[in-house]
Design a protein with these regions (language model features):
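PRPP-associated nucleotide enzymes
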Residues: 1-106
Length: 106
């Protein structure tokens, strides 16, 4: 999402960190989630028992988040589950994904 400045991404990161449960590491879905993933990863606990956080900028159908979660290396997260964060959700996200900003669901 090239429309946001680095400073705005840092603000979004802080907003997520204020309400997110702890996570081991953050992984951004290419391309839109890359910047957010790198910024959130700085806050990862590194603890194996904490979930991996999968992030993206916009959730439209949820397909890319679900596919990425299903295709993750099982060795990497077998002792924990995944949690998801998106900045903007155009639809109601699956239960494992939280949206910072939710568009009205009609």
């Amino acid at each position: 999402m090239d429309a946001l400045s680095h400073r705005e991404w840092e603000c979004i990161t802080q907003m997520i960190m204020e309400i997110s449960p702890p996570f081991r590491e953050a992984i951004g879905i290419p391309r839109g989630g890359n910047v957010l993933g790198k910024l959130l990863n700085r806050h990862g606990t590194g603890k194996e028992e904490d979930p991996i956080c999968i992030v993206d900028d916009v959730l439209t159908t949820g397909m890319s988040m679900n596919t990425y979660r299903e295709e993750m290396d099982i060795e990497r997260w077998q002792k924990s589950c995944a949690l998801g964060w998106v900045v903007f959700a155009r639809v109601r996200p699956p239960k494992w994904i939280k949206a910072l900003f939710q568009m009205p669901v009609i």
